[in-house]
Design a protein with these regions (language model features):
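Acidic anion/phosphate-binding donor-loop and adjacent secondary structure
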Residues: 95-98, 136-151
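Donor nucleotide-sugar binding/catalytic pocket of nucleotide-sugar-dependent glycosyltransferases
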Residues: 107-118, 125-143
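N-terminal subdomain of nucleotide-sugar transferases
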Residues: 1-40
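Hydrophobic anchor at the start of a short beta-strand
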Residues: 33, 83, 127-129
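Extended catalytic core of nucleotide-activated donor transferases of GT-like folds
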Residues: 4-6, 37-121
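Alpha/beta-hydrolase fold active-site loops
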Residues: 1, 82, 157
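Conserved donor-binding loops in enzymes that form glycosidic bonds
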Residues: 8-9, 88-90, 134, 161-166
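Conserved donor-binding/catalytic core segment of Leloir-type glycosyltransferases
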Residues: 4, 152-166
């Protein structure tokens, strides 16, 4: 089995991080993986040397393609035995889009969590689906980091949040 992974792993975004971790996890599991970037912005994000090595490999002989992007960007390709969609959504459904139509052309769909699976079912996606969480290299959490020294925050309550404002 040889897998072609197409995704935005060079974009410096959360999507890029997910694609990066997926590619490295496939490689660590012993899958013969080749990756190709899908550029969705003009940011040059950090890419590990291992990813660049996998990117330099030939895509000849790939029998599975994983498309890690938004469903309207996906396309079925009959040259592969399997066309896998790996996608994210933060909505309860996507009925009023072409996403289900595009997804239903593919062989199977992978989603990171139950809520995306539920949104897919609610939107009439009928291909076989699987929950494939975004992998995480836990070694980075065992590393010791120097605390940030921000003088004007000394002896003050500091509230951290990770969020998105749209």
């Amino acid at each position: 089995m040889k897998v072609l992974y197409i995704g935005p792993y060079k974009d410096g975004t959360g999507w890029a991080h997910s694609a990066h971790e997926n590619i490295l996890a496939l490689d660590a599991a012993g899958v013969d993986v080749v990756c190709r970037p899908l550029k969705l912005n003009n940011v040059e994000g950090e890419v590990s040397p291992k990813i660049l090595e996998l990117e330099s490999k030939s895509d000849k002989g790939c029998d599975i393609v994983i498309q890690n992007c938004l469903p309207h960007q996906m396309d079925y390709n009959g040259k592969f035995d399997k066309n896998i969609a790996y996608y994210f959504t933060e909505t309860s459904h996507f009925k009023n889009s072409t996403w289900a139509e595009r997804l239903n052309l593919l062989t199977e769909g992978w989603v990171p969590c139950q809520s995306v699976l539920d949104a897919s079912v609610e939107s009439n996606v009928i291909i076989p689906m699987a929950i494939v969480p975004v992998p995480c290299d836990v070694q980075k959490y065992q590393k010791a980091y120097e605390p940030l020294n921000i003088p004007h925050l000394k002896d003050k309550f500091v509230f951290y949040t990770i969020g998105e404002f749209s």
